[in-house]
């Protein structure tokens, strides 16, 4: 390799892996590929191999890669005004806030706080809960076991995964993780609870939906006890589940939601959206962000949301869910145990703990998917996919399953 390490890594597998191992923080482990460009639902690696991307940056690239609307929004706004700080307002910021309020159904009383990620949005939600309890005994915050709300310290405390917290103790105090049952919520709830925070679908737990009726019950219970109901829509928002936001499937009105990922279509942006009286909890000086709500990010986010709406991509997510469920079942693989999730956030349950092997086989066949856990494959493709991409996914995924099944048979294990 060139001795000048400031040069761009060359696109050979060994070279880029050496560069990544030397220059990038190790918290992500080994990178699985070096991608150099994308278009639509496809990406290409440094050797010009083409892949069907059914992960979309983990539910981020709602419009796929290099969508003209995304590119035009970045180009036009970068040439106009990128950032001025939150001492000032900009037209894209105001427009995106109004759009989020309308899509979430907050009414006039809703407000929007912009950050740069889902973790930042959830940190803002944690502060919202603290402000709700300010000056009272409401110091308890409830979240669900198995939930994931981010890796910054406040968001990590909200996350119901002890293994992720173990190296960073002590956690922010006052957060308790409970089972995702109405009975557990009733038992835990009292007048000292400031908020309950839940995900409509726990993506990082293996695409696990809340029990039927849970959100409606949670809304009634929290309201009865004067606690906030905060819904983490970072992975489920922006049309991914076949509704604009996951809570809308339950027909409830929360006190706040957090959003990120798909609302930027690949540009880093997050937001806390508040409803009703919760909108009055923040006051000047209680929270802030240098880059949150910058003109460039909100121009892109506003354009992405507008395209999702005008192109009918929320309905498309629901349509493609039906096709994918039927197609996955029709594969007839003994490795498939079922499908969980909604819209285009689906978890394919496996009958053996071979998810990582399936992911590797899929990549060899030119398909990008994700192992949510040892026995679940997560798919979260662009909302723009059509019949052709669904058919190609089923072909490639079927081939990957066959590869793993054959390997299991050779090893003498049940396939």
Question: Where are the predicted features?
Answer:
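Conserved N-terminal phosphate-binding loop of PLP-dependent enzymes in the Aspartate aminotransferase
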Residues: 2-415
